[in-house]
Amino acid sequence: METPSRASRLAAELAADMAQLQADGRLRLLREIAHGPGALAEWQGRIYRNFSSNDYMGLAGNPDLRRQFYARYPDAGSPELAQSSASSRLLTGNTPACSRLEQTLGELYGNRAAIVFNSGYHANIGILPALAGSGDLILSDKLNHASIIDGLRLAAADFRRYQHLDLQHLCDLLAKCRSGYRRVFIVTESVFSMDGDCADLQAIARIKREYDAILVVDEAHAVGVRGPQGTGLAAEQGVMEDVDILVGTFGKALGSTGAYAIMEPEVRQYLVNHMRPLIFTTGLPPVILNWSDFILRKCAAMDAQRRRLMDLSRMLRGRFRDRGLKTGGDSQIVPLVVGADQAACDLAQHYLDHGILVFAIRPPTVPRGTARLRFSLSAALSDDDVNLAASL
């Protein structure tokens, strides 16, 4: 009998693992979804109202903005529309478009230094390992994003996770541990992606000052949506001066691709020399960088849309509460917590049957027993769209 090849044995073992995931109702699949104008999406031949996108400000799905952007470049062959930088930034991939975008970001955030990354994941797996080493401690909110958790694991520093938004637990850890470490980093999201709740950054800033810590805030779900000119929750709460490193993304409310961080010039220069996901990757293409610069300037003036988005969020959350449903948060992310995995899947199907595109979020993305539907609202949704979602 012929011995199976290593490749076929691997395939069989992985297939068995996938079969178990499917039996548990947790098999993940890639869905082909076409994004239409506004908050519409097409899936499997049907048009849906999209409540699952991170296009919070409706910018990514706005064809008029795309036309305005491309009208700035009459020559389609312009190097400003190039689809590749063809190099890492430390070689020849640091294009004029990249420098302009970083200048725009720096000006938006009070003339601090800015640096652009290929994604938020790149930023979060690179910043902490570059800055935090042996003899340092990282204290991270327990519900921080997986990319932050991966960054903790890659860093040579010790790390502890404090209970979600439990600042007394954070203080207890600092009181116990601070004296034994050179540097201590406090890392939190501002708006949390699964619960839609917000960190009390004013209180965290006071703790940071009391214990001489370094504060890193991931504003992925707040930039574009919160704060003056969409600069985030730290600016809204008046604590930008206390944030040592602010991480933002272009891939959500700002309708583009990539990420950025705001910091002091010395920190930026250190990252350029030590941050591996920045050093060892091809830079973003000029067309994306120019689009990000264009959209960043547009979004800064969209205070009316930001107010509308918060109004829609309060409307949906309030309607759920009026019906006795379990929800929470204080942002454009509105969770509807169901509990059991299959019940969440069944409810998601019910919404799909009524033209609402929203999916079940299950473990391990959320804790066991807290499967939910995660409604990501967009300023492009209508009142009728939200009323329909609230009534099903």
Located regions from the model:
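Conserved PLP-anchoring active-site segment centered on the Schiff-base-forming lysine
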Residues: 127-146
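Structural motif of enzymes handling amino- and sulfur-group chemistry
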Residues: 283-302, 308, 312, 322
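PLP-dependent enzyme catalytic core of the Aspartate aminotransferase-like
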Residues: 1, 61-63, 67, 71, ...
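Conserved N-terminal alpha-helix of the aminotransferase class I/II PLP-enzyme fold
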Residues: 71-119, 313
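Conserved PLP-binding catalytic core of the aspartate aminotransferase-like
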Residues: 307-314, 321-355, 369-370, 377-379
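Active-site phosphate-binding strand-loop segment of PLP-dependent enzymes
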Residues: 160, 164-217
